[in-house]
């Protein structure tokens, strides 16, 4: 059977908990109550901020150089 990878598979064990914690912290900072009753815009703002912070963290780890 072929090895099937999904782009949603986490490569680092324990990353899911760290990302969930980040999501809760950002939602709190933004005053967003995550859930089904929250607008897509509000929930999306949290996801967008997570992406910005993860990219920033990766850039810092790489010392600003692109590989």
UniProtKB/Swiss-Prot annotation:
Biological processes, Gene Ontology terms: DNA topological change; sporulation resulting in formation of a cellular spore
GO molecular-function term, one example from the UniProt record: double-stranded DNA binding
Annotated site, Cleavage, chain positions: 25-26
Pfam families, per database record: SASP
Superkingdom of this protein's organism: Bacteria
UniProt key word DNA-binding: yes
Keywords noted in UniProt: DNA-binding, Sporulation
Biological function: SASP are bound to spore DNA. They are double-stranded DNA-binding proteins that cause DNA to change to an a-like conformation. They protect the DNA backbone from chemical and enzymatic cleavage and are thus involved in dormant spore's high resistance to UV light.
Other known facts: SASP are degraded in the first minutes of spore germination and provide amino acids for both new protein synthesis and metabolism.
Matching PANTHER family: SMALL, ACID-SOLUBLE SPORE PROTEIN A
Family membership: Belongs to the alpha/beta-type SASP family.
Protein name as catalogued: Small, acid-soluble spore protein B
Organism listed in the record: Bacillus subtilis (strain 168)
Gene giving rise to this polypeptide: sspB
């Amino acid at each position: 059977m072929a090895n099937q990878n999904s782009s949603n598979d986490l490569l680092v064990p324990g990353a899911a908990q760290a990302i969930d914690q980040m999501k809760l912290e950002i939602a709190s900072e933004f005053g967003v109550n995550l859930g089904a009753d929250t607008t897509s815009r509000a929930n999306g703002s949290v996801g967008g901020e997570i992406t910005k912070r993860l990219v920033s963290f990766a850039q810092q780890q790489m010392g600003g150089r692109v590989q």
